[in-house]
Structures are given as structure tokens and as C-alpha cells.
Design a protein with these regions (language model features):
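Catalytic phosphate/metal-binding cores of nucleic-acid and nucleotide-processing enzymes, i.e., regions
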Residues: 5, 61-62, 300, 436
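ASCE P-loop NTPase helicase motor core
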Residues: 13, 17-18, 24-221
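N-terminal accessory interaction module
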Residues: 330-331, 528-599, 619-687
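Short, conserved phosphate/pyrophosphate- and ester-handling motifs at nucleotide-, phospho-/glycolipid
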Residues: 8, 60, 262, 448
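Conserved helicase motor core of P-loop NTPases
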Residues: 11-19, 23-24, 142-145, 149-154, ...
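N-terminal pre-Walker A segment at the start of P-loop NTPase domains
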Residues: 1-13
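C-terminal accessory regions
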Residues: 329-338, 343-527, 531-534, 554-561, ...
Length: 688
């Protein structure tokens, strides 16, 4: 029997309440290893037992295939589920440029039962930002909005990991954001967040690393990045390629993927992998090559989605070259050579294995960019229009003009335009497969997929102590289902980049003394003096009538008296203690000890919830101070600085400076004794 964690049981109860309640949206969030997919399968079985229909979707073909395999429930892409290929509008460019006609595809008619429940897996990838390419767009161009329009009030369950990368060109994941649902769609939202790691995931170093990154993202604290190693996680100090090659001697391993930060890095790895397996003089494409689809394609009877990995079963050596003149404006044009190749590919989708004969755009195989540029896209359209029948070709200028000016098309124009779209949708060259080598890819391309063996090159130009990088790293590391190798990963703690300066002498240190909020530090010190004096069988009185002089007098049981002046400033005491009078050596010794010991309060609290690593460092410093018998007097906060006021061999200050990311950059130390402060020097050496 399936053993559910307590948070999973809570989610099951919340889901059942959702089915009976008024809310339209249920958001199931959870990090890697918390059992989201297990719950989705449980929810689907529960709905089936109720004889209630469910539809399972994912943003990409690979994600749909994975969730279908894991839940044993049919799944499709969101696009396939909600859109038809019926053209509902068109548009055209202006200014004499070859921008072409634009087709928009409508939402399907929804005939599902009103109590149908839709499930969207990998919801962190679902965008609500307007999106279209040179020739096509779907619905309104906003996928999440179109999904709500299609659902038409039916219930939707969004499932995802809120720590993963958001959709491209968005800085958050709208499909996991309850406030976004409420404000944008005006719907009632409920949900649950899974936090417990499932029992079978215990002991996974890979998962432990991901959990630490997720916690940093949730805390918005990026001051520490380090990855532990273990049986399922290895640091590849010499590079990723040797362990990658070790998986398979004679051909690329289909259960492995290399993930990089940039497209250019991915290209370099792809070239290296091909050189190793196929030789330095190998043709650009061979049977056995793996390709990654870089643009959605609907022309071959089966969807090919951005990010799909396909295997080349056969390919022709001959390349067809179409030289295309593309107008840039009314006066300028440029020749764009398009190279095409016939290829047979195989891959798996949610329904099973698929084999297709396609035309491949050979230009893009080793392109260092993530998508074809607008000039190439326009060249594909111009190349298509060169092959049109003269009747359609002659009518295009007037059709473009009418569309540009939003004028209605005549009956003849409508028929010609319908023929144009029909031919465009089935033209093998216009609909050439846009793909590149598929051994290495960026994290955005890998998102939604998983591999048994994942190799992550974690280098990026620019900083790593930020939310974007942590989300990227978390998403990349969680693509592995079995083993992970990482290379060039950051390794820093909140203090590892801190420069520790030599001790400076300060002849006029005024040390802050902690006092509870609302109290006077002078009165707080005298309370400590009274308590210490009482333990030594002394009585104490004080006089604060003179500015900056705290006069304290002690009397013993024999009537002997000793008096002192403790000098202070606005924020605390200096190291100047002036004995005024004493008529007993024994009393003098006791009083000196009381005065010295009274400087340090019993405890100095430190709270900084907005900087969790500051609290961690404060605890670390307190432990070192106690070990070295250095008394902590106060901790104050100044501009980008935490200051620890201490009584070491002399009075001293330890200044810890941090940057706007919460990372400590350097430590400044000052003492009334300078470098001769032995205790403070011992403290300093702890950080070297």
C-alpha cells in the first residue's frame, strides 16, 4: 500500500475539499523529492473512481511523455489539448520589408463534461506573456490566459516546483502564483505545498543539495553556495567530458544530457561530443546523431516541440541550397542561403514511438543562438512564396494591403488566402525542422525533462550570488533522476570571500555596552556592579551628576571605601577607568575585579531575520569569543557593517562589512592595545 507523507495526506484532503468546493484552481507546489507526481497519480485514480473525467497536460512534449509514463495516464501538450489548426486571423508587415502574412490558430471547441478536471504538470514553465513567431501564433498569444478561456470555468490543477526557473522573459511563474490567478482571472484559488521529502529519497546527496538551494531561494539569501558530493553526486574537477564518455564507448548515451548556462557553451560541448564519437572529419550529420528541436513544428502529423530530443535514423548527404533574396526595406535586400537536408528521425511522445521523414534546416545545426533569427525566418517565408502558383502570388500584394489597413477581404481574396495558408502549413521547406545537436543544451531547453545521468557545467559570466543563478542551478541539478556530475560550480560561504585586515591601534575606543531597549546603558552597568559587589560582600553606590563621569563607590564590611570614575561617551564606556581613592589593598583588589567584570553584559542578543547568514555568523563569532575568553559587550549595526564590541586583552571592536547581497567582504579590527592585543590576534587568526 502506498505510504504518503503527512504533507501528502494534507494535500489529498485539500484536493478532495477542492473538488466539492467553489474554487476553480488548485495549486500543488513542491520541491524535488516531495512526491508531486505520486500525488497526481493518486488524484487521477480518485477521479476515475468517481467516474469523473480528467485531462493531463504539460507545457512540452518531453514533459508530457514523462508524466504519462509516471502516472500511466494519457497526457498531451497544452497546445495540442486546447488549440486547433483553424486560422482565425492574419496580419502583415509594412515598410516594404518581407514580413509576410501571419496566421493565428483558434482555441478548440470544448466539449468536455462540466465536471472535468484539468491537470497541468511542470506549471512553472507556463507563461502568460504574449508570444508569437514570424508566421504563427496561438489564440491570444498568452498560453495561460487561453487555458482559462478553454476551461471555461472547469476546475484546473496546476502542479509545479516554485523554485525552478520561471518562463522565458518572465521573472515569476504565473501558473504557481495564487495572487496572479485572483487578480488576472478573478477566480477562487486553493492549494497545498509539499515540504517533506519522501522516504525513498532520504540519503540522496543530490536531493540534499537541491533542498539547500531551494531554501536559499525561499529565504532570498544568496550568500552561500556549495555542493556536497556523494554516491549520486560528483564534482568533475577535470571536466565533464571524460565521465560523459565513460557511460558509452561507441555512441552517445541516450540517457545522458549536458546542461550549460549559454547556447554557445552548449555548442562547444556538442562539437566535442561529435568529434569524440564520430571523428574530427565526420559529416555535419550522421545516422545516430541526437538532435534537440528548437522550434515547435506541427507539419508532420505529430507535434515536435521545442526541447524534444530526437534520434537521426537516416540522413542524406546531399544538401539542397536555396539562395533567397530578402528585402530589408524598400531599397535594401540581402541574400540568405538556406540549406536543407532530408532526414529520418525517431522519438517518443506521450502516445509511444514515432518515426518521421522530415526536411531539416541544416543551417541551424551549429548555430550558437537559441532560436533562428528573424532574417532566416523571413527567408523561409520568401522562399515559400517563390514556389506559389502565379494566381496566389499575383494576389498577395492586394491581400497584404487589405490586411494591413484592416479592410475586409473579397470573396476571391478569402479563397486565395485560404489556399495560401493551406500550402504554407504543408510546405516541407517552410516547415523544415529547426533543430541542433542534442547532446548539450541550456537549462531552459532541458526544463521539463529528466535524464538518468546529467552533467552540469555551472560556469556563467557575471555574478552567481543572485536569485536568477540559484534558480538556474536548482533547475539544472534537478534534471537528474539518477546521477549528477557538476563542473566549475561556485563554492563560497558567507565568509569565504572575506578579507581579514591586521589589527589597528585605537587610543580612544569608546565601546558600546548592550542595554535592553528603552534602558540606560549606565544604569544597566551599575545593576551588574551591584550584583557582582553583593557576591563579594561589598555594597556599591553610584553618582551620575557629572557629565561623562560615572562615579562608583564600594564599601566593605569593615567600613573601608574605594571610589572610581568610569569614563563614558554618548554610546558607551571608554577604556579609561580612574581609581580615585581606596584605604584597603584587599578592597582595592575586589573592587578592581568587580569594575572589570561589570563591563560585559550577561548576554548580547542578535536578531537579523532579513539576513539569515548574519545570524549564523554571529553565533559562530560568539562561540569563538567564548573559547578565547573574550567578553562580548555589544553588537551594533551600521551602514553595511555589523560591529562586535569586545573586551579582549584590551577594549576592541570587530567590524564586519557586507555587500548588498549579504556576503561579508572584509573584517576590520581595532584595539586599545593594537597588535599587542594577544586575545584579539588569536581571534583574527581563526579567520585566516
Amino acid at each position: 500500500m502506498l505510504q504518503l507523507t503527512s504533507s501528502q495526506l494534507n494535500a489529498v484532503a485539500a484536493f478532495k475539499a477542492f473538488l466539492d468546493g467553489a474554487a476553480q484552481v488548485f495549486v500543488l507546489r513542491g520541491a524535488a523529492g516531495t512526491g508531486k507526481t505520486t500525488l497526481v497519480a493518486e488524484f487521477l485514480r480518485y477521479l476515475a473512481a468517481l467516474n469523473r473525467e480528467s485531462v493531463l497536460m504539460a507545457p512540452t512534449g518531453r514533459a508530457a511523455y514523462i508524466i504519462a509514463q509516471k502516472t500511466r495516464h494519457a497526457a498531451s501538450t497544452i497546445h495540442r489539448a486546447i488549440y486547433s489548426l483553424k486560422v482565425i486571423k492574419s496580419a502583415s508587415g509594412a515598410d516594404g520589408a518581407d514580413t509576410g502574412l501571419h496566421a493565428q490558430f483558434a482555441l478548440r471547441s470544448n466539449d468536455d463534461r462540466r465536471n472535468t478536471v484539468y491537470f497541468v504538470d511542470e506549471a512553472s514553465m507556463v507563461s502568460d506573456k504574449f508570444n508569437e513567431n514570424e508566421a504563427f501564433s496561438f489564440g491570444s498569444g498568452r498560453l495561460l490566459s487561453d487555458l482559462f478561456s478553454y476551461a471555461d470555468g472547469r476546475k484546473i490543477v496546476f502542479v509545479g516546483d516554485h523554485a525552478q526557473l520561471p518562463p522565458v522573459d518572465m521573472n515569476f511563474s504565473p501558473a504557481l502564483d495564487e495572487d496572479y490567478f485572483r487578480t488576472t482571472f478573478g477566480c477562487t484559488v486553493t492549494g497545498c505545498t509539499l515540504r517533506e521529502v519522501m522516504r525513498q529519497s532520504d540519503g540522496s546527496v543530490m536531493l540534499a543539495n537541491a533542498t539547500r538551494l531551494r531554501q536559499s531561494i525561499e529565504d532570498a539569501d544568496y550568500a552561500e553556495f556549495t555542493l556536497a558530493s556523494g554516491t549520486d553526486t560528483k564534482r568533475a574537477d577535470a571536466g565533464l567530458l571524460d565521465p560523459y564518455y565513460a557511460l558509452s564507448a561507441d555512441k552517445p548515451c541516450p540517457t545522458a544530457a549536458i546542461i550549460t548556462y549559454s547556447n554557445r557553451q552548449a555548442l562547444e560541448y556538442n562539437i566535442a561530443v561529435r568529434r569524440y564519437y564520430f571523428g574530427a572529419d565526420a559529416p555535419r550529420l550522421l545516422a545516430g546523431d541526437m538532435l534537440m528541436v528548437a522550434r515547435n513544428n506541427y507539419a508532420y502529423g505529430h507535434e515536435l516541440f521545442n526541447g524534444n530530443i530526437v534520434l537521426v535514423k537516416a540522413c542524406e548527404n546531399d544538401v539542397m541550397v536555396h539562395n533567397v533574396n530578402v528585402k530589408l526595406d524598400k531599397e535594401r535586400s540581402v541574400c540568405v542561403p538556406l540549406r536543407f537536408r532530408k532526414v529520418t528521425i525517431a522519438y517518443r511522445n506521450a502516445e509511444g514511438p514515432v518515426t518521421l521523414d522530415v526536411i531539416l534546416l541544416d543551417n541551424f545545426l551549429d548555430d550558437p543562438h537559441g532560436a533562428i533569427d528573424s532574417l532566416t525566418a523571413r527567408a523561409l517565408r520568401v522562399d515559400f512564396e517563390k514556389r506559389l502558383p502565379s494566381k496566389i502570388k499575383d494576389a498577395l500584394p492586394s491581400i497584404r494591403k487589405a490586411i494591413t489597413h484592416k479592410a475586409p477581404l473579397t470573396h476571391d481574396q478569402q479563397e486565395i488566402y485560404a489556399d495560401y495558408i493551406r500550402l504554407l502549413l504543408h510546405d516541407p521547406f517552410y516547415n523544415a525542422l529547426i533543430a541542433k545537436y542534442g547532446y548539450a543544451m541550456t537549462c531552459h531547453k532541458a526544463q521539463g525533462g529528466e535524464w538518468e545521468n546529467v552533467f552540469v557545467d555551472m560556469f556563467r559570466y557575471g555574478g552567481t550570488a543572485n536569485e536568477n543563478y540559484f534558480r538556474w542551478a536548482y533547475t539544472a541539478l534537478t534534471r537528474a533522476s539518477g546521477r549528477l556530475w557538476h563542473f566549475r560550480s561556485p563554492d563560497y560561504t558567507y565568509i569565504s570571500r572575506m578579507t581579514v585586515e591586521p589589527i589597528q591601534r585605537s587610543g580612544n575606543i569608546c565601546t558600546s555596552i548592550y542595554a535592553a531597549p528603552g534602558s540606560d546603558f549606565r544604569k544597566a552597568r551599575f545593576e551588574r556592579i551591584e550584583a557582582l559587589a553583593s557576591r563579594a560582600s561589598l555594597t556599591a553606590t553610584d553618582d551620575l551628576s557629572k557629565d561623562y563621569q560615572h562615579r562608583v563607590a564600594f564599601t566593605d564590611a569593615d567600613g573601608h571605601r574605594a571610589s572610581y570614575i568610569l569614563w563614558y561617551k554618548a554610546k558607551g564606556y571608554s577604556d579609561r577607568v580612574q581609581p580615585v581613592s581606596c584605604d584597603s589593598d584587599e578592597l582595592r583588589a575586589l573592587a578592581d575585579t568587580v569594575v572589570a567584570d561589570s563591563l560585559a553584559p550577561a548576554d548580547v542578543p542578535f536578531a537579523c531575520p532579513e539576513r539569515p547568514f548574519a545570524e549564523k555568523l554571529a553565533a559562530h563569532i560568539k562561540a569563538i569569543l567564548a573559547e578565547l575568553d573574550i567578553r562580548l559587550l555589544d553588537i551594533t549595526h551600521e551602514h553595511y557593517q555589523d560591529v562586535f564590541h569586545v573586551q579582549a586583552s584590551g577594549l576592541a571592536k570587530i567590524g564586519l562589512y557586507y555587500n548588498d547581497k549579504g556576503i561579508y567582504t572584509y573584517m576590520k579590527l581595532a584595539s586599545s592595545l593594537g597588535a599587542d592585543d594577544a586575545k584579539l590576534e588569536a581571534f583574527r587568526q581563526k579567520f585566516e
